[in-house]
Every structure is written in structure tokens, then in C-alpha cells.
Amino acid sequence: MYKQIVHAIGKAIQTLLLGLIKSYRYLISPVLMSSCRFYPSCSCYAETALKRFGVIKGSGLTVWRLLRCHPFHPGGVDFVPEKSNEMV
């Protein structure tokens, strides 16, 4: 039962975060122009990471990516890692 509750809460948070990303793309990003140093853009990376890994790991990957997106980092191609089927 707790597993179902935790899963439902995780899905709700994931939906909220994806909505925030979509809002950023349509409301803020057009004003800032293209300023991301990476491909895919940080918002696209965040969306993919959240969908692929869920809230906790996806958010961690997104934060790490955002910390590297600054004028002193060269940027480049940085895809979200593939999901491993291994049990850790």
C-alpha cells in the first residue's frame, strides 16, 4: 500500500516538474533567446531525465547539468545516460 502511495506522489511531482519545464520553454526561454551551451538544451535534458529516471535521479542529473551550464564551461553534446537494467 505504501509503495502505491509513494509511486502516486512521485508521479504527481514528476508531472508538476514537467509542467514547470514546459512553462519555462514557452514563457521564459523565448525571451532569453538561445543561451544553453549544450545539446540537447538543458530543458530538453531535464525532461528526458525525469521521464527516463523518475523524480529523484532525474532531478539529480538535471541539477548536475544546470551547474555545468555557465559561461566558463565549453558545453557540447551531453545526452541523458541510458537506463541500465542492472539491479544495484
Curated annotation (Swiss-Prot):
Pfam families: YidD (PF01809). It is found in: Cell inner membrane. Disulfide bonds: none annotated. The keyword Manganese does not apply. Transmembrane segments: none annotated. It is a peripheral membrane protein. Its main location: membrane. GO terms for cellular component: plasma membrane. It comes from the Bacteria. InterPro entries: Membr_insert_effic_factor_YidD. Keywords: Cell inner membrane, Cell membrane, Membrane. Could be involved in insertion of integral membrane proteins into the membrane. Belongs to the UPF0161 family. This is Putative membrane protein insertion efficiency factor.
